[in-house]
């Protein structure tokens, strides 16, 4: 139950990996912009998910903390 708050951390790590891919050589500016935009979108998703999870976990409503993000992002 307490480890569900780590989900946003894993999402953040995915966005950091994408950010590192933007530093590869021989890429066009268009590809770099697309990768960075995708990384920032994933970062924003992690922030929203972290706030929702921590809000509901602090009230002891784990089922809502998992159910609402799943319904929102479908």
From Swiss-Prot:
Originating species: Mycoplasma genitalium (strain ATCC 33530 / DSM 19775 / NCTC 10195 / G37) (Mycoplasmoides genitalium)
Disruption-associated phenotype: Not essential, it can be deleted.
Membrane topology label: Multi-pass membrane protein
Protein name, UniProt field: Uncharacterized protein MG131
TM region positions: 3-23, 35-55
Keywords: Cell membrane, Membrane, Transmembrane, Transmembrane helix
GO CC aspect terms: plasma membrane
Subcellular location(s) of the protein: Cell membrane
Main location as per UniProt: membrane
